[in-house]
Amino acid sequence: MSKKLEITLNRSVIGGTGVQKKTVEALGLKKIRQSVVREDTPAVRGMVNRVSHLLTVKEV
């Protein structure tokens, strides 16, 4: 069974750069405290690392 990540948006992207806004949107997050579950792949890890100051990540 592959690992999954539960990603939660904790801070707003208002005031962030365009790249940060698009990265959060690409993860499937729109609202604060919204959570999504994604496969633990290098691409997802890279997106999470880019906006880690806005997110909380847990392994599921």
UniProtKB/Swiss-Prot annotation:
Q: Which gene encodes it?
A: rpmD
Which UniProt keywords are given for this protein, alphabetically ordered? Answer: Ribonucleoprotein, Ribosomal protein
Organism of origin: Oceanobacillus iheyensis (strain DSM 14371 / CIP 107618 / JCM 11309 / KCTC 3954 / HTE831)
Q: Name one Pfam family in it.
A: Ribosomal_L30
The entry assigns this protein to a family as follows: Belongs to the universal ribosomal protein uL30 family.
**GO CC terms:** cytosolic large ribosomal subunit
Q: Which GO terms describe its molecular function?
A: structural constituent of ribosome
Its recorded name reads Large ribosomal subunit protein uL30
Query: Which PANTHER family does the UniProt record give?
Result: LARGE RIBOSOMAL SUBUNIT PROTEIN UL30M (PTHR15892:SF2), MITOCHONDRIAL RIBOSOMAL PROTEIN L30 (PTHR15892)
